[in-house]
């Protein structure tokens, strides 16, 4: 379920070596999934934008004029597509919008993100700077230039009314990367992909990743590996037992590794911020 990229594989300077531990991707991705039923995810948005290069993320329509995505999907020249299933065909259901304003969560560490995106670094600097780094609050609201028309293929997804439970059955969707093979990193699916897995305890993710896993995050995936979101899926929805609960945020690289589930923003904790931001800027 990935699309172009906002992918971060942390490469080191000098010899071109990489960290001895797993690389980090600040973008979730879809591995081990299947083609979603057409328009079964009518709230799904595809975002294309620029930030040094062309990039892609997912998003969620939470209001007729607002899309929720990940803060690390920040960029310029956004194009938002809704009602899309197959990127390779002209679909009459597609609505295209531009973004008139963007509102990343004020507590998201954009300085740390920019450092991660812009630097080639030696091993010592990498671990000193990013071991235990906190990428909480990875949310951003995008105001569209005009409201979209709600149809069978374009629908608003309701915010959660209660927290998810560990053990819930969840799925995530997107056009992000579908291969764990980095030689195929630019081979992205034309059709919207879905993958299903389980909501795990945060302790399981805390032991699996070098970034900090906080109470503002959700841990989801298969401990056996092989099923995951991937590069290009970031910002897309995590739906657990039929309820919108998370936004795809980050995970290990390559995607879908055994013992390394993905990390999602816990949307329930941000309902007030989402509602207040929309009310203040509509």
Curated annotation (Swiss-Prot):
Sugar-bearing residue positions: 100, 109, 122
Activity regulation: Strongly inhibited by aprotinin, moderately inhibited by secretory leukoprotease inhibitor, the Kunitz-type soybean trypsin inhibitor, and leupeptin, and not inhibited by urinary trypsin inhibitor or alpha-1 protease inhibitor.
Enzyme class: hydrolase
PROSITE patterns listed in its UniProt record: TRYPSIN_DOM, TRYPSIN_HIS, TRYPSIN_SER
Disulfide feature: 36-194, 57-73, 170-240, 205-219, 230-255
Gene Ontology CC terms, in alphabetical order: extracellular region; secretory granule
Keywords: Disulfide bond, Glycoprotein, Hydrolase, Protease, Secreted, Serine protease, Signal, Toxin, Zymogen
Assigned protein family: Belongs to the peptidase S1 family. Kallikrein subfamily.
Subcellular location as annotated: Secreted
pH dependence: Optimum pH is 9.0.
Main localization of the protein described in the UniProt heading: secreted
PANTHER family cross-referenced by the UniProt entry: KALLIKREIN-1, KALLIKREIN-RELATED
Enzyme active site: 72, 138, 234
Entries under InterPro entries matching the protein: Peptidase_S1_PA, Peptidase_S1_PA_chymotrypsin, Peptidase_S1A, Trypsin_dom, TRYPSIN_HIS, TRYPSIN_SER
Domain Peptidase S1 positions: 30-279
Propeptide: 18-29
Molecular function terms, GO-annotated: serine-type endopeptidase activity; toxin activity
Tissue specificity statement from the Swiss-Prot or TrEMBL entry: Submaxillary and sublingual salivary glands.
Function: Has kallikrein-like activity, converts kininogens to kinins, and has dilatory effects on the blood vessel walls. Shows highest activity toward Pro-Phe-Arg-MCA and Boc-Val-Leu-Lys-MCA in vitro. Has preference for Arg and Lys in position P1 and hydrophobic residues in position P2.
Xref: SMART domains: Tryp_SPc
Signal peptide: 1-17
A Pfam family annotated for this UniProt entry: Trypsin
Name under which the protein is recorded: Blarina toxin
Entry EC no(s): 3.4.21.-
């Amino acid at each position: 379920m990935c699309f172009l990229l906002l992918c971060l594989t942390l490469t080191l300077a000098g010899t071109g070596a990489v960290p001895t531990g797993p690389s980090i991707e600040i973008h979730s991705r879809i591995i081990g999934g299947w083609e979603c039923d057409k328009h079964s995810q009518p709230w799904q948005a595809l975002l294309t934008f620029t930030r040094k290069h062309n990039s892609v993320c997912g998003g969620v329509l939470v209001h007729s004029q607002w899309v929720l995505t990940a803060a690390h999907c920040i960029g310029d020249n956004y194009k938002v597509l809704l009602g899309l299933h197959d990127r390779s065909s002209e679909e009459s259901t597609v609505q295209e919008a531009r973004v008139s304003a963007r509102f990343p969560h004020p507590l998201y560490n954009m300085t740390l993100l920019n450092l991660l995106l812009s630097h080639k670094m030696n091993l010592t600097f990498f671990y000193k700077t990013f071991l235990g780094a906190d990428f909480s609050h990875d949310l951003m609201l995008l105001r569209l230039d005009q409201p979209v028309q709600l149809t069978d293929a374009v629908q608003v997804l309701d915010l959660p009314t209660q927290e998810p439970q560990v053990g819930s059955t969840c799925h995530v969707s997107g056009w992000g990367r579908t291969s764990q093979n980095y030689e195929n990193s630019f081979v992205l699916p034309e059709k919207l992909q879905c993958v299903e897995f389980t909501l795990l305890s945060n302790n399981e993710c805390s032991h699996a990743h070098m970034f900090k896993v906080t109470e503002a995050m959700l841990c989801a995936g298969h401990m056996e590996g092989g099923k995951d979101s991937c590069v290009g899926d970031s910002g897309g929805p995590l739906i657990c037992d039929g309820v919108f609960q998370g936004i795809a945020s980050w995970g290990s690289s390559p995607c879908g590794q055994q013992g390394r589930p993905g990390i999602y923003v816990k949307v329930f904790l941000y309902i007030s911020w989402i509602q207040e931001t929309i009310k203040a800027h509509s």
